[in-house]
Amino acid sequence: MKGSSEHGETSKAAPLGRGGVSKGVSVLDLILRFIAIIGTLASAIAMGTTNETLPFFTQFIRFKAQYSDLPTLTFFVVANSIVCAYLILSLPLSIVHIIRSRAKYSRLLLIFLDAAMLALVTAGASAAAAIVYLAHKGNVRANWLAICQQFDSFCERISGSLIGSFGAMVMLILLILLSAIALARR
């Protein structure tokens, strides 16, 4: 049997060095930040623009539901807005990590801040999810009626806005793991 090296052929593919892997991790970090920005921004906008009005007997008497009626949903909008602003402000550091993949202290700072933002977006999304559940199911013991039978488009929008927020939670978890892996390789 003749191997490819007997014919003078050599492999052109060199193994990927640490610099290439670190740069790849930094590029993935930047991409995940953009995805998380989109998720938190979409969630904040979807929830912040949610309202529905129902006529009651006449056109002069109406029932209205909007996100600002419930402080929990207001907290959800504020939490997603803060996390979105943080993610936008963290983009330059993420770009620095692509250029200088050896930056250690800035990556450590991002781990702590990403963890704090993960806690904030988790608190906002969890609180809003509880209210969305009550809006759909109600609570017989507390005599809270489900409102989604009447305000169906309101409930669809507040339920849909949770998707982006929970997606951003996953992205932040991945960002923390990526940064930890990048630091552990040093």
Swiss-Prot record:
- Write down the glycosylated positions: 51
The record lists the lineage as: Eukaryota, Viridiplantae, Streptophyta, Embryophyta, Tracheophyta
- How does the UniProt record describe the way this protein sits in the membrane? Multi-pass membrane protein
Query: What is the protein named?
Result: Casparian strip membrane protein 3
Q: Which organism is it from?
A: Sorghum bicolor
**The keyword Transmembrane helix is assigned to this record:** yes
Checking PANTHER family in the record gives: CASP-LIKE PROTEIN, CASP-LIKE PROTEIN 1U1
Query: What GO CC annotations are associated with the protein?
Result: plasma membrane
Q: Which family does it belong to?
A: Belongs to the Casparian strip membrane proteins (CASP) family.
**Ranges annotated as spanning the membrane:** 27-47, 75-95, 108-128, 162-182
Identify the keywords attached in UniProt to this record, alphabetized: Cell membrane, Cell wall biogenesis/degradation, Glycoprotein, Membrane, Transmembrane, Transmembrane helix
Q: Protein biosynthesis as a keyword?
A: no
Extracellular side stretches: 48-74, 129-161
Q: What does the UniProt function comment say about this protein?
A: Regulates membrane-cell wall junctions and localized cell wall deposition. Required for establishment of the Casparian strip membrane domain (CSD) and the subsequent formation of Casparian strips, a cell wall modification of the root endodermis that determines an apoplastic barrier between the intraorganismal apoplasm and the extraorganismal apoplasm and prevents lateral diffusion.
